[in-house]
Amino acid sequence: MVKKVLLINGPNLNLLGTREPEKYGTTSLSDIEKAAIEQAQLKKNDSEVLTYQNNTEGFIIDRIHEARRQGVGFIVINAGAYTHTSVGIRDALLGTAIPFIEVHITNVHQREPFRHQSYLSDKAVAVICGLGVYGYTAAIEYALNY
């Protein structure tokens, strides 16, 4: 079982709860992070979830690199728009060799065509999209039991 999971959220996800609530719901990123941390605590086996959000690609890459040094065993990532553009985030995930799940609140395949391409999904253990914020719960549960 993985003891340490890193939950990464990319650009604009800090606006959850107020950004396009008809699409993303009204749950804030803070609420999602708190729920993930509590989910790990309920395991009662010293599991923990670390959380990180940044709007800047380079800082996200740096955080992925840091995860390896911290002994993170699994990453759950919603890279937001960087999903569709960032070779750098893909390479960072591959370079650290930490297994990861890609999460999206909306079903990206029902949205604009440019959102159908992911630079991450072919290397992810799994992709969860379209389940709303429950997708985070499912991903964290899987990661904690990996």
Curated annotation (Swiss-Prot):
InterPro entries associated with the record: DHquinase_II (IPR001874), DHquinase_II_CS (IPR018509), DHquinase_II_sf (IPR036441)
Keywords attached to this entry: Lyase, Quinate metabolism
Active site: residue positions: 24, 104
The keyword Lyase is assigned to this record: yes
GO molecular function, one term: 3-dehydroquinate dehydratase activity
Residues flagged as site, Transition state stabilizer: 19
Pfam families, per the entry: DHquinase_II
Subunit organization: Homododecamer. Adopts a ring-like structure, composed of an arrangement of two hexameric rings stacked on top of one another.
Keyword Lyase attributed: yes
The protein's role, per its UniProt record: Is involved in the catabolism of quinate. Allows the utilization of quinate as carbon source via the beta-ketoadipate pathway.
Name of the protein: Catabolic 3-dehydroquinase
Similarity remark: Belongs to the type-II 3-dehydroquinase family.
Organism (species): Candida tropicalis (strain ATCC MYA-3404 / T1) (Yeast)
Pathway annotation: Aromatic compound metabolism; 3,4-dihydroxybenzoate biosynthesis; 3,4-dihydroxybenzoate from 3-dehydroquinate: step 1/2
Binding annotation for substrate: 78, 84, 91, 105-106, 115
EC number from the UniProt entry: 4.2.1.10
BP terms from Gene Ontology: 3,4-dihydroxybenzoate biosynthetic process; quinate catabolic process
Gene name for this UniProt entry: DQD1
CDD domains: DHQase_II
HAMAP family cross-referenced by the UniProt entry: AroQ (MF_00169)
NCBIfam families per UniProt: aroQ (TIGR01088), PRK05395.1-1 (NF003804), PRK05395.1-2 (NF003805), PRK05395.1-3 (NF003806), PRK05395.1-4 (NF003807)
SUPFAM superfamilies, sorted: Type II 3-dehydroquinate dehydratase
